[in-house]
């Protein structure tokens, strides 16, 4: 029972870290791109607001953490593109780093074999790295859906505002497809196969 609770806690901690990290990277890029904004309110720095309870439940059930995005009011196409790309790149960096740690075996981590360790406390870091890999792959796949508030929506808004308007009109249908994909566990299946392929 301790092992199950430990694994659930580690999964929730990894999901919360990814949600906060993903949104904070976008916040730094926004501050860099919008240098004319002198006074930045404290609301974006309250990082616990980025942790979504539904996203935590989805991270436990489907390995797809969804963070509450901070809604940037951006009219500049270049800033929209930079925000979307920053979100995608941040998730790719976490995915590549955790897969590299799993593949190269840093810190006693040897691939996906964490249950052979003699004591449960020795398994904390390997389980954390595995969940970071799985959850970042799931969050990356989710953010590549053309939903207006996700990273792909920001990229489309940066490339073509007319296409973004069309995407907003079809947002309900795309969200329905996204929910079906998450419920059918297709993102988790694809993410786990991708990670096993890299290992």
Question: What does each of the following model-derived ranges do?
Answer:
Residues 1-199:
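Hydrophobic transmembrane alpha-helices and their immediate loop junctions
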